[in-house]
Amino acid sequence: MKNIRNFSIIAHIDHGKSTLADRIISECGAISDRQMSSQVMDTMDIEKERGITIKAQSVRLNYKFNNENFVLNLIDTPGHVDFSYEVSRSLASCEGALLVVDASQGVEAQTIANVYIALENNLEIIPVINKIDLPNADVEKVKHEIEHIIGIDCKDAICVSAKTGVGIKELIETIITKIPAPKTDDEAPTKALIYDSWFDNYLGALALVRIYEGSIAKNDEVLVMSTDKKHIIQDLFYPHPLSPIKTQSLQSGEVGVVVLGLKTVGDVQVGDTITSVKNKAKEAIGGFEKAKAFVFAGLYPIETDKFEDLRDALDKLKLNDSSITYEPETSLALGFGFRVGFLGLLHMEVIKERLEREFNLDLIATAPTVTYEIYQTDGELVKIQNPSELPPVNKIDHIKEPYVKATIITPSEFLGNLITLLNRKRGVQVKMDYITPERVLLEYDVPLNEIVMDFYDKLKSLTKGYASFDYEPIEFRVGDLVKLDIKVAGENVDALSIIVPNEKAQSKGRELVSAMKEIVPRQLFEVAIQASIGNKIIARETVKSMGKNVTAKCYGGDITRKRKLLEKQKEGKKRMKAIGKVNLPQEAFLSVLKID
């Protein structure tokens, strides 16, 4: 066991983490060059296309060093903020981590968040400066940044190019010499941490585990500690990118895949502990929490008869991703659909894209919202995720909304614009730190509701794509909030309701109705688009009616005849206006996202 090294790679998106993982795999000879597809560790198509790692993957590698055989377990972590819980579980399974920073870009916001998780788990951190082959690489500047922001000594940082293979051998040898072997105790009660789980069509739900203490073997009876359910181990594998390698047992310190013949991933949740029935642990490994949804949106099939197909698709995705929550809801405007909870905005985009791509569904998504805590006058606390569920104003004592701590690293030339944006988003400055004269680190407390709409896009366009951004939830705070309703032709469109700060309600209402005016198709009658708070109309626009020339067939002749026809048309339009229905296009529901 002293020759096992468990390590993971921490990096910001696009800093070359998956490429570096591929280089380490091929250097250890686990895959021949012919079999090497770029990004072996990323298995979902959507991961390769977006260049992001969503699920934590693992691979067991063998390497000979100083005439000794070593086992290297590379545990890949997702780099994106939405998946930080998966990151924390992956890092809890390791003794060390490679901190990969792009030599041309420097330290980014997400890197910092993940490094702090690694430091909390007391991991040995090896700084790795990647992409040194780039013409604009500045190794010394990046070393200074790592020391200044993260406080890790960089005099022994390893410089590599994952693309050309420079420095990879030295990196692997540093992993062996610097990262400690796992502390093991084969006789202690069995404890195995699940740090990833996924669904296989033939084997059912699979759990990727790191054995902390004790050991498990095929045909053992084990217990999943949070559910208290017993299962028999049907098979054990060592993870490998091409085909897993069967094994009869896993000892403490090792990493492997456990097959329990389960139907859903919900039975083996990330962060849970597996223990043996005959050698049972008294308590689980700390830190387990069910993944909590932060951002909610309504998903509706464009063809209403596809509702059951959407339910089946969500059920299947849930097998693989236990963090999604969903429940059926109906909307007067959109029919039947689901209110779906996601870990964050990227997670929402990925899930929507997977539903459309893997299950051939056409979906309308409503504006994303967050959870609000409504304290009622009768003392009751109600939590809502859908603005249309907000109780009447006279029943509300106060409303609390979730806040997040936003960390932003930006070139200093964009600082003024960014501070203006953050102030407009009701942000409160906590910290401002010049890393170098050219780069600034900002910390702000911002309401999550202001971030879920379009904050990320605005941040990127204001800073020409150079700023990086990361956030973590902190607490609920009292806010002066109201519900803004949109009426089209006198009818409330529930899917367009949003909760906004009182001082912004007037301007948001005006922007929304003028955006809607451009989108709502013209009818044969006038259509009023109104924004209201409670019963009070605060903004209005009118979509003019299409004219039909009813007097065209009167040649010359009596003016009263023409007047009679025009009067008749006016009557008809009045009737139509009273009962007319307006079909709203998909863009109308997206217009909510576009307003600032």
Curated annotation (Swiss-Prot):
GO terms for biological process? positive regulation of translation
What residues does GTP bind to? D14, H15, G16, K17, S18, T19, N130, K131, I132, D133
Record keywords: Cell inner membrane, Cell membrane, GTP-binding, Hydrolase, Membrane, Nucleotide-binding, Protein biosynthesis
Which cellular component terms (GO) are annotated to the entry? plasma membrane
List, in alphabetical order, the Gene Ontology terms for molecular function in this entry.
Answer: GTP binding; GTPase activity; ribosome binding; translation elongation factor activity
Identify the enzyme class.
Answer: hydrolase
Query: Where in or outside the cell is it found?
Result: Cell inner membrane
Q: What does this protein do?
A: Required for accurate and efficient protein synthesis under certain stress conditions. May act as a fidelity factor of the translation reaction, by catalyzing a one-codon backward translocation of tRNAs on improperly translocated ribosomes. Back-translocation proceeds from a post-translocation (POST) complex to a pre-translocation (PRE) complex, thus giving elongation factor G a second chance to translocate the tRNAs correctly. Binds to ribosomes in a GTP-dependent manner.
Put simply, this protein is called Elongation factor 4
Organism source for this protein? Answer: Campylobacter jejuni subsp. doylei (strain ATCC BAA-1458 / RM4099 / 269.97)
Q: What is the lineage of its organism?
A: Bacteria, Pseudomonadati, Campylobacterota, Epsilonproteobacteria, Campylobacterales
